């Protein structure tokens, strides 16, 4: 089994549910403050905890809110701009060429003047594979620690939307093999090892009932293969 070493603050933040003072949505820094003061028998500043509620009025996803740069197999400048997002994952150019229609760089329009481009894998519904209902996003690795942002674009339909890379040249309903993964990176890595023209699907995290149901309804004759990790998310 993997062994991890924590300091007190790291342990509290990694395992907040072990502490009675924790409430869903509360700031982890606030939790650390409360727990440490209790351990030291210091008086605790009693105040109403700030719980961050999910946005219920979030704006629906709209691709027009982004500037898009697509990977063009005939233009090296576009390939060069995508390169940093694939380098650390070891995804080679041949694999990028194979999937080039299924990803692009997306820069959100912002009012503060800042500009951040993410590698975006478009999410769609199996029943409407040509419509984009969100983005699975990956950022560039930071120089200081090598870590990178990962998530989904605001307003994405995460409960039903899937990244669907159909390399067969046939309609989705006629597909015979569907390969499932937790991320588009994982799907591309599998193809790089075993380059088979199948349908590659990413759930962008823990799979949902809506994602699975939607795909099964559209591919009733297909065989499905799971390439999920063996961690908690992959078993979800």
Describe the role of every protein-language-model region.
Residues 110-217:
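Phosphate-handling DNA/RNA-contact segment within nucleic-acid enzymes
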Residues 7-20, 106, 123-125, 141-142, ...:
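Short regulatory "switch" loops immediately downstream of catalytic or recognition motifs
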Residues 16, 90-95, 194:
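Glycine-centered loop/turn motif at secondary-structure junctions
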Residues 83-91, 121-124:
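Serine endopeptidase catalytic core focused on the charge-relay Asp
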Residues 1-87:
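Non-catalytic accessory segments of DNA primases and related replication-initiation nucleases
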Residues 7, 81, 185, 189, ...:
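Short Gly/charged-rich anion-binding patches and loops
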Residues 6, 12, 18-22, 192-236:
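TOPRIM fold recognition
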Residues 92-114:
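Short, basic/aromatic recognition patches
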């Amino acid at each position: 089994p993997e062994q991890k070493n924590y300091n007190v603050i790291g342990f509290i933040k990694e395992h907040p549910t072990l502490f009675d003072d924790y409430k869903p949505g509360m700031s982890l820094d606030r939790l650390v403050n409360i727990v440490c003061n209790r351990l030291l028998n210091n008086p605790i500043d009693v105040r109403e905890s700030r719980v961050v509620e999910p946005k219920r009025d979030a704006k629906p996803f709209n691709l027009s809110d982004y500037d898009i740069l697509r990977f063009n197999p005939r233009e090296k400048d576009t390939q060069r701009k995508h390169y940093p997002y694939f380098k650390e994952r070891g995804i080679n150019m041949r694999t990028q060429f194979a999937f080039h229609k299924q990803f692009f760089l997306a820069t959100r329009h912002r009012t503060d003047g800042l500009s951040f481009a993410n590698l975006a894998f478009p999410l769609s519904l199996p029943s409407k594979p040509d419509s984009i209902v969100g983005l699975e996003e990956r950022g560039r690795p930071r120089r200081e620690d090598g870590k990178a942002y990962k998530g989904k674009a605001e307003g994405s339909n995460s409960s039903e939307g899937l990244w669907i890379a159909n390399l067969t040249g046939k309609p989705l309903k006629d597909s015979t093999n569907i390969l499932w993964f937790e991320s588009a990176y994982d799907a591309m890595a599998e193809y790089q090892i075993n380059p088979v023209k199948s349908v590659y699907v990413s759930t962008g995290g823990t799979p949902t009932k809506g994602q699975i149901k939607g795909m099964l309804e559209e591919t009733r004759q297909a065989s499905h293969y799971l390439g999920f990790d063996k961690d908690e998310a992959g078993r979800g």
